[in-house]
């Protein structure tokens, strides 16, 4: 049974016309691959409500029409390529920012945040500022900041592409573990073929804004790009 249904997303920009539809079961991962400029990141932003999705678009999540809801009401989280942490806030406050927006008290936020940071191996960094972190540490804080709100769907826009290969491999493995533990449904944009095959339950290839191929990871070959 489909948990997430995306129909007729459409946008015209930069001499490209983007069209996209997809379905996904609960707890599964859809991976979107394609060359730069094929519309992958734009699609994620349309799903998240950060960009208009077109007049005929429909997005249903858990049997609820979320097409016209604002981003903060969609129950969708997003992790970007750059961590985009607030430089003036300590890690504990960066990690719990979504809880602050929900009006949860500072004491309760920090109690929840400490548990999450420990889960992600960041418990010794609560009082540090973002500029003192490595790239991998900062991206893990970004993951915590998104997942702590317990969204039903998480969108990942090449979250590990700026990291070195060993760290990227480790965080890819960690992401699979976290998804099983937390139970979220995911859409991942990546250029990494092995990452796509390892994490995806379904893969879609985008070319110049159009869906060029859709299938299972074991059927996917690099020549399809």
Over which residues does each language-model region extend?
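Conserved ABC ATPase "signature" region
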Residues: 65, 107-125, 176-177
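Conserved ABC ATPase signature
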Residues: 129-133, 137-139
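Conserved H-loop
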Residues: 183-189
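Catalytic Walker B motif of ABC-type/P-loop ATPase nucleotide-binding domains
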Residues: 154-157
């Amino acid at each position: 049974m489909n948990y997430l249904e995306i129909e007729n997303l459409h946008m015209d920009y930069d001499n490209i016309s983007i069209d996209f539809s997809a379905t996904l079961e609960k707890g599964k991962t859809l991976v979107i691959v394609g060359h730069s400029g094929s519309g992958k990141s734009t699609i994620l932003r349309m799903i998240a409500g950060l960009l208009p999705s077109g007049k005929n678009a429909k997005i249903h999540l858990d049997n609820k029409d979320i097409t016209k809801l604002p981003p903060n009401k969609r129950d969708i989280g997003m992790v970007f390529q750059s961590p985009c942490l607030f430089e003036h806030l300590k890690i504990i406050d960066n990690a719990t920012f979504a809880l602050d927006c929900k009006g949860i008290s500072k004491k309760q936020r920090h109690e929840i945040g400490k548990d999450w940071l420990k889960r992600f191996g960041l418990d010794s960094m609560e009082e540090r500022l973002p500029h003192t972190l490595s790239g991998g540490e900062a991206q893990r804080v970004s993951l915590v900041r998104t997942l702590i709100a317990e969204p039903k769907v998480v969108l990942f826009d090449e979250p590990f592409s700026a990291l070195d290969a060993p760290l990227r491999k480790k965080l890819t493995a960690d992401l699979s573990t976290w998804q099983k533990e937390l139970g979220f449904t995911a859409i991942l944009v990546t250029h990494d073929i092995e990452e796509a095959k390892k994490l995806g339950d379904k893969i879609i290839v985008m070319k110049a804004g159009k869906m060029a191929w859709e299938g299972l990871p074991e059927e996917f070959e690099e020549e399809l790009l």
